[in-house]
């Protein structure tokens, strides 16, 4: 006799999210764009590495722009109209990721730079000699 097998759904259904928070983490090696709802639960994320860029190409501004456009495309499908942007990190992709979000048509309530700044904390890494 055949057993009934439960279907396990891996993805949640489409949620309607009118307002959210877009976090851009721009490091020297990669740019990660995470979208959360107002309560802080992650809705979608994208990164330069997840968009197909590998190695040194992940740290380029174009890779950051592609990651931001990828995240925004999913958000517009879920009905997001307004967003707040939090930018963190000193990487080269922070400005181009923000530019891609501005072009998308989502209304930005505010853009905040939340990069942690040390008050003379740990010693930074040495300068590179190439």
Swiss-Prot record:
The keyword rRNA-binding applies. GO terms for biological process: translation. GO terms for cellular component: chloroplast; ribonucleoprotein complex; ribosome. Keywords: Chloroplast, Plastid, Ribonucleoprotein, Ribosomal protein, RNA-binding, rRNA-binding. Gene3D superfamilies: Ribosomal protein S11. GO terms for molecular function: rRNA binding; structural constituent of ribosome. It holds the Pfam family Ribosomal_S11. The keyword Chloroplast applies. It is found in: Plastid, Chloroplast. Belongs to the universal ribosomal protein uS11 family. HAMAP family: Ribosomal_uS11. NCBIfam families: PRK05309.1, uS11_bact. Part of the 30S ribosomal subunit. This is Small ribosomal subunit protein uS11c. The lineage of its organism: Eukaryota, Viridiplantae, Streptophyta, Embryophyta, Bryophyta.
